[in-house]
Amino acid sequence: MLDHILSILIFFPALAGVLGFVVNKNSIRSYGVAVATIEFVLALWLWFVFDSNVSGMQFMEQIALIPTFGINYIVGVDGISLFIIILAAFFTMIGIASLGETKDIKNMIITLLFLQMTMVGVFAALDAIVFYLFWELSLVPMLYIIGAWGGPLRIYASVKFFLYTFAGSLVMLVGMLFMAYFYYQATGEWSFAILDWYRLILPESFQLWLFVAFFMGFAIKVPMFPFHTWLPYAHGQAPTIGSVILAAILLKMGTYAFIRFSLPLFPDASVYFMYPIAVLAIIMIIYTAMVAYAQKDVKQVVAYSSVSHMGVIILGTFALNVEGITGSIFLMIAHGVVSGALFLLVGVIYDRRHTKYMSEFGGLAHVMPRYATIFGVMLMASVGLPLTINFVGEFLSLLGFYKQSHILTLLAGTAIIVGAIYMLAAYKKMFFGVVTKEENKHLKDVNKRELLALIPLTIITIWLGIYPKPLLGPINTSVEAVVSLMHEKSLSEEAKQRIPSVAKDMALITKPTGEAH
Amino acid sequence: MVSPANISMESLNLITLVPMLIPIIGALLIIIVDLFKSEQDRSLYVMLSLLILGVDFVALMDTAGVFSKNGTIMGVFDVMLIDGLAILSQFIVVGASMLFIPLALTHKRFHEFTYPEFFALFLFMIAGFQFMVATDNLILIFVGLETASLALYTLIAMHNRDKSFEAAVKYFTMGALAAGFFSFGSMVFYALTGSVEINQIAAVLEANNYADIGFVLVGVVFLLASFGFKLSMVPFHTWTPDVYEGSSAALAGYMSIVPKIAAFVVAMRIFEFLIHSGVVWLEVILYASVVITMTMANVWALVQTDVKRMLAYSSISHAGFVMAAILIGTTQSNSALFFYWVLFSFTNLGSFSMLWISRQKNLPAHQQSDHSYNKFAGMIKTAPVAATIMALFMLSLAGLPPFALFWGKMYMISSAVTGGYTVLALIMALNSAIAGYYYLKLIVYMFMKEPIVENGGHVYSANATLSLKTIIGIAAIGTIFAFVAVNQLLEFITAFVYNSGY
């Protein structure tokens, strides 16, 4: 069974989704929770049997799909993808568990199960076409979730979401076909296997073009400034569960793909584009933070702050050293937990008041103390308070980039502090002061079902903030392999310098992480 | 005194005619049956046609076996040419016809199917297409083309609605113009080279090194225009949406596949040597027409309010996409053409069949046209299975993995990449993105809007019978599980295309 655990993880939810059509409407919620829990337990088991001392791929499976054209179903997991898979399973579980009263709940749960298949598939795929397959397929359930259960502008938002990503990914597909063609020219064999591509050293001019092609696909997904305009719409219109999954998992596909594809395939191009991308990332951090401050809608605040933090992830990724990349991967998890939780929290209040305008609230801390507490913890995590999960990721990302450029890191760091302002302002508007609105006086505090979703998230936020080692260890091992691959593959002198050789830095890195936490 | 010609039967190699003769004999058989006992039920003719096509398919498989053993077969004074292209395209022609013909067994009675002539004409048309693809001779191509087209005009007109007559007449006039262009173009080449055989023309032109380039240009322009009409390349496409709208949905789906593959094969035979002749302007003309066809058809499809018209424009766009294969002109691209078209047949026939089963006998008051977008609003609520299948076909047409057409698109774009047409590859990719919008539009209507009129869902399968559902089931399975067969299909097609020297 262990040989096929990844395939089981990928296809179990889909199979369960198909069978779900038979399940009665009244029992579908329990069915969904049960399936998602099994999936989560399987994912935890994967972590348990995962050997964290191995840097390469584990539990690899290979089935020939179109061998004449070099397309095979290859899946595998390493420290980089492991935790995102677990996160995906986790969020589907608590997402389904916390699902409020929804119309057509059966369709929703089946859709979520299919979405889970595509999410796990993206992070486990080791063949570019299989990756592309799940990547594209993930758009469909999300399109349906936003379009069918969303707000008044839901159709515009869902179509915009679909077309933006679809257009970007098609450019990426051309890039993938080129990559396979270069591999064919070099070896005489077609292959779309990522691990095969890793061995291919491309001239710098090719790298630049291919990097741009892949960048189009990934940057729209992340979404990076200036391609971010679809995201506020999608978040603004999506139902709570849609926003949670979108922010926690789907956006991570883009940042994950940067680490899986762009960096190891095109190390020279990554160095070449390091500063432009870092500048974009910093614009993203500052600009979206300012936009977030101007929002009246609390969900938009969370949405923009989520984009803002994605900028830090990009910055860490393009630090191109072990600290930065490890930090960015950790931050992906952290961002998933925290922004997912924030969207859930916004959903809680929306369920009660059917409005998301902050001016409608005020003094909620008196009425809903438990809600206010959890919101407060998540908010502190979001602004990156030490001893919360986000701090570890942000700190490492910035530390990584500090080695490349002091000034840009300083800018980014300041921006993150500024980010605290809008979050605190939003918190103040909503929770402090006196209760002004009559409707707010008798709001019910979070109920058991909501606590079931929120308490685990709170615990994770604090636990991994204090003791991030269980995650950092395996991530670090795999990232070291990626960075040393990049160092070996890079052609130009500048790239060799920018991407440090791991062997030399190893002692430096492992020690601080070991002691500090 | 003329001495009697002395020809041995062996040298005629009549086996090359067998696949065409089977539908012809079948058509005559149907007429004879009608002669003895008229007023038979349509199911008899449908099943007879299906059986005849089945026999034809087996005969083709035999021919394919001979081809893979001995290579290209010539026959009947070397007029017939059975090479890989001929065999592959005949497989598509006959296979798609077999999928089409059971669609006549609708729940509602449409009167064209009560005539045995419909089925006889249908089989004659297939024979015409088969002749068209299985020869190198411009005259026989012309004869095949006209046989098939004339039969097709009649089939459209038999739908017996005002719009059908309009469509048939429009198609007829446009077809006549195209035929004129074709014969004129052929004449120019005959005048230049003294031959109507494409390989002879190529050899002679090659030998004198394209000395009369001006005349070659004239000939090519006429031929291109004539294929433009047949393949509905922009700007010769204007008839397509109207004709599709006028004919029954099933026939429209059929027209988007079978006549086009026949025309593609002929275009491939003619333009193959011209592209490789190194005459730059030809490449430019083709490049431009490919890009314009893809892009403009997509843009027009965006603004349609009727699903059938949208699908008409979408099939124009797909034709432009596939035409790129002829421009690229490598073995991979030519294989990609057939590969794409096989997958396209499944998906497109499936989606037109979905329109066909929702066809009402009379137009309700609140509907502008037979298949307006509004009709499909909120379909997921009332007919979830049908809506899901329709969405599946739309996603496949949009090129979403892992559905059938994605593999075709991927292979086609890859052939552009390997053929050195980087910009074209990008244009093709971006066009797929544009196309995503209008396919998505139907999905949005079906899944995200509320039903406009309460109809209880029976509208969407008003016309459904077991045989229609079977065809849709086959198309859906072919669309979903294409990835299982992609490898074998690709190997098979590539071997055939490669062995015929394209």
Outline where the language-model segments fall.
Chain B
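Alpha-helical transmembrane segments of multi-pass membrane proteins predominantly involved
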Residues: 1-502
